[in-house]
Amino acid sequence: MLTSQVEHLLTRFSASQSSGNANDALATRNISTPVGSVRIYDSATDNRSTKPCVILVPDGPNVIEHYDALIALLTPHLRVVCFDMPGFGFSLPQSNYAHSLNQGAQAVLGVMDALKIDTATLAFSCANGFYALRAAQTAPQRITRLVLSQTPSLTAMHAWTSRVVPWPLRVPVLGQLAGWLFKRKAARSWYGIALPRSTDAAPYQEKTLNAFNSGACFCLAGVVQGLAREAPASLHGVTTPCTIVWGALDHSHKYTQPQSFIDCAPQADIVHFADCGHFPDLEQPARYAQVLLHAIGLPSATA
């Protein structure tokens, strides 16, 4: 696919021109998956950890480093794995990666295979939640629970895209070029829309821009176009236990109904964070950690 080839070339060009001095406060490494190399953090020092496992995925333009506080809260209780999806952060996309549901699920299950993780809870957000759903459909015996933030139904997400995402990003090739040229501007403006008005966006922006300077990618056009090709009904009827965490002050999702997610998983519980925007896991990590631990079945754990 031409769009995938364009993304592949643009992201590698940016990486080749970068400073190469990422602020790697967390010990990360790259591993191979069926859909390419991805950058991961793993709290386990070996593959023999007996703790329950949770897998986190940053919602771009966030990167793994944005999750340092949440990781610190969860690590005493869980094996914590965090990885950049292909096309985001430092997981540069392959020339055939089209951000389809099946490819996203392959990335998730590929990480689990590489790290010898039998079962895990997936704690994803926004568009990445759809890849978590497909992973649960593909390997229901391995995905024990879903904890998803700001993920509505795919129908509602398509409507959100039409309202919020500038039209050039929805056009193949043009979107890839525009997204690459203006990724810094897009990241700055995105935090202003996604966060509550009272929240200082500077710490979020600083980590993102530092990552960009070090060669990180932000293939927003690719994921928008990839999910636009998917049929909403293909994600209906997921039976995996699921919790939705919804930030009420997310201006980008002002007209999105979190209850729409029931189309995908009728059994889902919805937890509202009235004081949060688009990133409840980052804005209120201690509260989010308690919700996550309780969902996993560790209600007595103190984050």
Question: Which role does the model predict for each range below?
Answer:
Residues 1-54, 77-78, 117-118, 296-303:
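Alpha/beta-hydrolase fold catalytic core
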Residues 81-127, 290:
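Active-site loop/oxyanion-hole signature of alpha/beta-hydrolase fold enzymes
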